[in-house]
């Protein structure tokens, strides 16, 4: 005997209503779940208190980084400004980037290590000392590292880069070929804001 189509239709309608109800219940319950907050602080104020800005090492030993004026945090288009403090004896990673970079030394002294961009790898770096109230520029794509060579005092620098956010290539050592350098983009201090900006599209 063939099933009664009206009974099948009624059963399907009941099942559909049940599933729709379950779906609404799940959506309603999900709306009460905590939402993961981004630690990205966006601030387009004309005047900002640096002491109130987020500061972190971002997993880089001996570094304290503040994005004073940035592309992702503050809407900057052409330049980005960082305030960085490097502990005695510590170094930034060996890296290069396709943007201009200018350092102004506010406190302390250190050594700039500069590798070659014209060879297959950075090679033995040139060591260039610097001290408080000096400034130095990094040529585009030249591998470099900033070292607080002082054993007692922090090194504090104001850093300005062009074309933010920076695309940074990291090296394990000075003999690593340029083609093996690893792109880190977004860089560690841009990750939260980069994800938030991407999510807003």
Curated annotation (Swiss-Prot):
GO-annotated biological processes: auxin-activated signaling pathway; cytokinesis by cell plate formation; positive regulation of cell division; positive regulation of cell size; positive regulation of DNA endoreduplication; unidimensional cell growth
Tissue: Expressed in roots, coleoptiles, leaves, stems, tassels and ears.
Keywords of this entry: Auxin signaling pathway, Disulfide bond, Endoplasmic reticulum, Glycoprotein, Metal-binding, Receptor, Signal, Zinc
UniProt PTM: Glycosylated.
Chain positions of motif Prevents secretion from ER: 198-201
Function: Receptor for the plant hormone auxin.
Name by which UniProt lists this protein: Auxin-binding protein 1
Species this chain originates from: Zea mays (Maize)
This protein's encoding gene: ABP1
